[in-house]
């Protein structure tokens, strides 16, 4: 479990586009999302430092909850907690659940906002569609009052020449997730070549949404239910893992059913079916031609055998006739 305070230089860290934040001593943000969506990179953009290990790959980099902090120019402390990828919960992984629940220790004064991170570079997976259920299972219904959706890889929209609204029009599942958090969302571009000004703007927009969350919750942070002896107790973890396993089983069956239906009706499947049909017809035609050729060969062989027999008989008759003529010729000479 890592931790640390990253100081931001007042001269270079503050961008002209940023406004001073209300003087709340500190804010705590928690990053949640599937592996490879850019959670750690988003945390680094917020902290303005390479505080968390981050790699552009699907394999999980974050194995345990980590807390890193930065001091903003107005003196406010921003705490960012990075968590293991939710993807590792499927099939349910008790150790990952236990690790995520450690937020209760790292955020003892509560959480001001939960940042649910999705990547715009990839389609929404079945696991990601189940995120609302997983969050509800892990933290309870009230967690949605603190949820903000962060879309990473904003540059992919520019590459595809589409707006975020156009992108969401084709993603009804995203709309459902956004509806659960009152459509609070922000776009992030975490590339190294992204300008400091752009990064400052996106972080400021995020912090504006955090303020909105605070106002809606009367400045009360999300507090964990500590009625249990420990959030990571075996009983609590087992109960949550059981619910997630049951959910995953249902999703898997539905996913396989959808996949089979999609595959059967896909253009590729139809092409394959056409190829199989054509191949079958060709094989049938080849078999017919082969059978016809075999029949022709049989008839030719039979004719050859019959002709050979007739030639043999004719030859024998000629030989006998020749002998008869020779005998007659000899008889005539004696007389």
UniProtKB/Swiss-Prot annotation:
Which regions form coiled coils?
279-331
Species the sequence originates in: Arabidopsis thaliana (Mouse-ear cress)
**Matches recorded under PROSITE patterns:** G_AIG1 (PS51720)
Name this protein carries in UniProt = Immune-associated nucleotide-binding protein 11
- GN (gene name): IAN11
Ranges for region G1: 33-40
**Positions of the AIG1-type G domain:** 24-231
Residue ranges of region G4?
Answer: 152-155
Iron-sulfur recorded as keyword:
no
- What InterPro entries would the database entry show? G_AIG1, GIMA/IAN/Toc, P-loop_NTPase
Induction (free text): Up-regulated by brassinolide, nematode infection and cold treatment. Down-regulated by aphid infection, 2-aminoethoxyvinylglycine (AVG), high CO(2), isoxaben, and propiconazole treatments.
Q: In which tissues is it expressed?
A: Ubiquitous.
Question: Region (G5) spans which residues?
Answer: 189-191
Which Pfam families does the record associate with it? AIG1
Query: What keywords sit in the KW lines?
Result: Coiled coil, GTP-binding, Nucleotide-binding
One of the record's GO molecular function terms? GTP binding
Region G3, as annotated, extends over 82-85
PANTHER family in the record, alphabetically? GTPASE, IMAP FAMILY MEMBER-RELATED (PTHR10903), IMMUNE-ASSOCIATED NUCLEOTIDE-BINDING PROTEIN 11-RELATED (PTHR10903:SF122)
Family, according to the entry, reads as follows: Belongs to the TRAFAC class TrmE-Era-EngA-EngB-Septin-like GTPase superfamily. AIG1/Toc34/Toc159-like paraseptin GTPase family. IAN subfamily.
